[in-house]
Amino acid sequence: MQEHGFEEVPGSKLNYDMSVRYGISRDQVKKLIRIFNESAAIGFLPALRDSMYYVKRLHEELGYRFHCITSLSLDPNAQRLREMNLAKLFGPTAFERVVCLDTGAHKDDALEEYEGAGCVWVEDKPENAEAGFRVGLNCLLIEHGHNMHYYHDHVRIVKNWRGIYELITS
């Protein structure tokens, strides 16, 4: 955001709400997120922490296949860039399915088809982790600055993909 002229409000670095973090309207935030999500940058997102190593291990050594549900965009070019980025980072077969919802959309409806499946659901947004819990998924929340004080009886906080790997394989 700084490269586009937006300065962070002092003391707001850990706030998930970008309108608070940058002192701009929610409408402007939505527009900026959509612009970013539909840009070429989506094809070059870096992997989070140790995810490349542990996702590959889960997939290649243990046969896990991943489904990604992302509130990216309905734009087909953005969707394709995201799929290409995931394949580049994790290999061509780790992600069996990528579901792209509209920018900022809630994931409740998309998660309904997994109801009762008992799958592991990895999230970074507490509201989406809770949506996974409501349909019976085993919810893991990756810790970030914006969610590090979150607590829910049925959502386990993990610091990284090593923690996820250890939970799954123990």
Q: What kind of feature is each model-predicted range?
A:
Residues 1-28:
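Active-site neighborhood of HAD-like aspartate-dependent phosphohydrolases
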Residues 2, 56-60, 133:
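Anion (oxyanion) recognition and catalysis
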Residues 11, 48-51, 78-83, 104, ...:
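A structural signal for well-ordered alpha-helical scaffolds and beta->alpha junctions
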Residues 23-38, 62-67, 90-93:
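Short, basic/glycine-rich phosphate-binding loops at helix/coil junctions
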Residues 42-47, 51-86:
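Substrate-recognition element of Asp-dependent hydrolases with the DxDx(T/V) motif
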Residues 69-120, 126-129:
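Substrate-recognition "cap/lid" segment bordering the active-site pocket of phosphatases
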Residues 108-118, 125-170:
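Asp-based, Mg2+/Mn2+-dependent phosphohydrolase catalytic module
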